[in-house]
UniProtKB/Swiss-Prot annotation:
Region (Disordered): 1-34
Polar residues: bias regions: 1-29
Presence of keyword Transit peptide: yes
SUPFAM superfamilies: GroES-like, NAD(P)-binding Rossmann-fold domains
Top enzyme class: oxidoreductase
Pfam families, per database record: ADH_N, ADH_zinc_N_2
The protein's Enzyme Commission number: 1.-.-.-
InterPro entries for the chain: ADH-like_N, GroES-like_sf, NAD(P)-bd_dom_sf, PKS_ER, YIM1/Zinc_Alcohol_DH_Fams
Protein's name according to its UniProt entry: Probable zinc-binding oxidoreductase, mitochondrial
Domain of life: Eukaryota
Signal peptide bounds: none
Length: 331
């Protein structure tokens, strides 16, 4: 284990002045891990920002004194509990819950249950784009859909899945996982110019929502409706998703509550619908690592900024005019 004396007493940290959304770069004490709680001290190499995270304090009770953005972290273990499978010097990545300080600082804290080994074929910045998006996609498809509870040979055989905002950071991961899982058809909605990208990620059909709604597309030909529809955008997109789900199908959203967006007068039978929030799962992220290292999945990175340019990076994320993740290079 690395010596405690090798850990600097202070470090750079981008802190949010809650309840405001103001961010400042400060010099703060290096966090001390509690080994009894499975905490590891991580030297952060890169962190990815998330749109809307500066407003999460209105929904989440923070368990730490500091509010630091950057839920996606890629870094090196500095200190670890004696029983941890992750040792000092290990290259790891993870998703940190919004209730704790994130990765926009020199050192941060991560739990054993959150960590996975960083893919060897990704740079630090590339690895930081993966955890939040990939885990959200994984849990939507494999945990929340209910399709994996039956006999193995019947789970996806002949099944169709539709994904809204399929060219986005989460949607593109769902497409890849659905392709690997063997769905009979994978439908993805996207805007102008993204059709080829969506198909390259695994979609059998790309629907340009600016010219054709998902509801209209599904109604054009018999058999186009999906057994599973996953919404990654909310609002009108979620309302439109109702028109594409089969009777007896499943509609999931990670953005809003499907029943609140259900169009008035729409007749659907026995559709199971729900909203979910992903949970940090190192065991699932490790499976993603294996897929990435095998060349079966790819990432999507928009841009990289040094930590000192945190405000420019944040402004870009909040503009929503990005394609992929915006990353802060910390080390």
């Amino acid at each position: 284990m690395a010596s405690v004396t090798s850990v600097p007493k202070t470090g750079r940290s981008v802190n949010q002045d809650v309840p405001a959304t103001t961010l400042t770069l400060q010099t703060r004490p290096t966090p001390a891990p509690n080994f009894d709680e499975g905490e590891h001290l991580i030297r952060v190499h890169a962190t990815a920002l998330c749109a809307g995270e500066l407003y999460w304090h209105t929904y989440v009770t923070f368990t730490k004194e500091e509010t630091v953005p950057g839920p996606d972290v890629a870094g090196t273990v500095v200190l670890a509990p004696p029983s941890s499978p992750f040792k000092p010097g290990d290259d790891v990545y993870c998703r940190i819950p919004y209730s704790r300080a994130g990765g926009a600082r020199d050192h941060t804290i991560a739990l054993t249950s959150e960590l996975a080994r960083k893919p060897k074929n990704l740079t630090w910045e590339e690895a930081a784009t993966v955890p939040l998006s990939a885990l959200t996609a994984w849990q939507a498809l494999f945990d929340q859909s209910g399709l994996w509870e039956g006999p193995e040979d019947e789970r996806v055989k002949g099944k169709r899945v539709a994904v809204t905002a399929a060219s986005g950071a989460v949607g593109m991961w769902i497409l890849q996982f659905a392709r690997i899982a063997g769905f009979d058809a994978v439908i993805g909605t996207c805007g102008d110019g993204n059709e080829d990208f969506v198909k390259s990620m695994g979609a059998t059909d790309a629907v340009n929502y600016k010219t054709t709604s998902l509801t209209a597309w599904a109604a054009e030909k018999q058999g186009r409706k999906a057994d599973l529809v996953i919404d990654c955008f909310g609002g009108k997109s979620l309302a439109d998703a109702w028109g594409c789900v089969k009777d007896g199908g499943v509609l999931i959203s990670m953005v809003g509550y499907p029943e609140q967006e259900k169009p008035a007068g729409l007749e659907v039978k026995d559709v199971k619908s729900h909203f979910f929030i992903m949970e940090p799962r190192g065991d699932q992220l490790q499976k993603v690592t294996e897929l990435v290292e095998q060349g079966k999945c790819s990432f999507l990175m928009d841009s990289v900024y040094p930590l000192e340019q945190f405000q420019e990076a944040t402004d870009k994320v909040e503009s929503r005019r990005v394609r992929g993740k915006v990353v802060l290079k910390v080390l």
